[in-house]
């Protein structure tokens, strides 16, 4: 008696003429709202109060392993142009960032390894998150920033176009490699300090995330892909909106 097929990845009948898995599209990343609550929890407040690496005053934040792809040097230039300290979380080629900071007269704070709640607190208390990565596949940090009420300022490139609509839930900006580009970044950083913008951008950002990028949406997307390949799996009528920027 033939065994019921319970693994389909290697089965030719589930592949197209080029032997690629059939019916496979984009499975969007997801955000856990409990990790990024809209309001500061008591635990987060206590963590922030005793956080020994807490910056003094307003600061910009960048998250991710420092490297060319992440645009870490460009982030330093933006901070220098805005005359605000840059806090970096994620390690990587931080010596290059330090040299860039010395070159442009920027204040750079390199965080040691910190835990998730400390990152959330750093994110919530930042003036703005800046993301200058090249060819970013998706980009979770702008979503995380929006969830905790911090403006996300990103380059108008690749994955960031899936999550940020310029002027609606953050700012999408040109590369900061020209005088005009840097001017637009400094103006956006000023806008990020206005309470009306912070409130409106965060509200729109949370709405987009919860309507497109929740764990339920990710699970449903996976279930529907499996169902399309003939796997017996329960699916629901959850509305899955396109991930791409509707603008």
Regions inferred by a protein language model and the residue ranges of each:
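Conserved donor-binding/catalytic core segment of Leloir-type glycosyltransferases
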Residues: 50-70, 76-81, 87
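Short hydrophobic beta-strand element within catalytic cores of glycosyltransferases
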Residues: 151-155, 164
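Nucleotide-activated donor-binding/catalytic signature segment of Leloir-type glycosyltransferases, i.e.
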Residues: 97-117
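Short alpha-helical donor nucleotide-sugar binding micro-motif in glycosyltransferases
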Residues: 113, 121-126
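A short, active-site helix/loop in glycosyltransferases that binds the activated sugar's phosphate group
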Residues: 1-26, 31-41
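Glycosyltransferase donor-sugar binding loop
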Residues: 31, 63-66, 83-98, 112-113
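Aromatic "clamp/platform" in nucleotide-sugar-dependent glycosyltransferases that forms part
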Residues: 134
């Amino acid at each position: 008696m033939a065994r019921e097929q319970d693994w389909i990845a290697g089965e030719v009948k589930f592949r197209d003429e080029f032997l690629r898995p059939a019916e496979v599209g984009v499975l969007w990343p997801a955000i856990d709202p409990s990790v990024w609550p809209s309001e500061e929890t008591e635990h987060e407040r206590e963590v922030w109060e005793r956080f020994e690496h807490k910056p003094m005053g307003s600061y910009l934040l960048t998250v991710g392993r420092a490297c060319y792809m992440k645009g870490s040097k460009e982030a330093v230039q933006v901070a220098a142009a805005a005359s605000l300290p840059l806090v970096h979380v994620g390690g990587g080629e931080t010596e290059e960032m330090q040299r860039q900071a010395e070159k442009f007269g920027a204040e750079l704070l390199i965080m040691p390894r910190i835990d998730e709640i400390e990152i959330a607190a750093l994110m919530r208390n930042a003036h703005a998150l800046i993301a200058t990565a090249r060819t970013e596949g998706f980009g979770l940090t702008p979503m995380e920033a929006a969830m905790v009420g911090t403006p996300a300022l990103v380059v108008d490139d690749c994955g960031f176009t899936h999550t940020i609509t310029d002027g609606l839930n953050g700012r999408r900006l040109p590369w900061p490699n020209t005088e005009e580009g840097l001017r637009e970044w400094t103006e956006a950083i000023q806008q990020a300090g206005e309470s009306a913008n912070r409130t409106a951008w965060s509200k729109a950002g949370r709405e987009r995330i919860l309507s497109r990028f929740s764990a339920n949406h990710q699970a449903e997307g996976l279930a529907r892909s499996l169902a399309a390949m003939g796997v017996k799996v329960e699916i629901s009528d959850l509305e899955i909106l396109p991930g791409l920027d509707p603008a």
